[in-house]
Design a protein with these regions (language model features):
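A solvent-exposed, acidic/Ser-Thr-rich amphipathic alpha-helical stretch
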Residues: 1-75
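Short beta-strand edge/turn micro-motifs at domain boundaries
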Residues: 40-41, 48-132
Length: 132
């Protein structure tokens, strides 16, 4: 967030977000995001990091394409979200711009015959949040 590298995982991220919500007097406030726009592009159409063998593209050019691979499930995506952020519960709270960039990659656990219930199809590989 704003250039800080978080290597400690989800717990470090939660601690940082909680600290952002604190007022100088120590009261935790609500944070309100108003998305004004977003844009998504394919970053890598053939993302294969940790891809199971059965989903890799067959080397035989005459082989019938697998239903799961022809839908570009192997692509990684770049998602950019912009908008306004306000710290405080009411609509009168001061606002500032934000920009959030995500790299989304396929969740290979969802590309099996019986995937886990409520599993997400995409996972966040990288996130870069900037409050401007």
């Amino acid at each position: 967030v704003n250039g800080a590298v978080l290597a400690g995982g989800p717990d470090e991220y939660e601690t940082m977000v909680k600290a952002q919500r604190q007022t100088p007097s120590g009261i935790e406030t609500k944070v309100r995001y108003e998305v004004e726009g977003w844009d998504v592009h394919v970053l890598n159409p053939d993302f294969t990091l940790a891809c199971p063998e059965n989903l890799l593209t067959p080397t035989d050019p005459d082989a019938k394409p697998d239903r799961r691979t022809k839908d570009n499930i192997k692509a990684s995506l770049l998602l950019q979200v912009t908008g306004m952020i306000s710290y405080g519960g009411d609509k009168e709270a001061p606002k500032s711009m934000f920009n959030d960039v995500f790299v989304l990659v396929p969740n290979w656990d969802t590309h099996v015959k019986n995937p886990p219930r409520h599993a997400r199809r995409w996972l966040v590989m990288s996130q870069n949040f900037r409050a401007l």
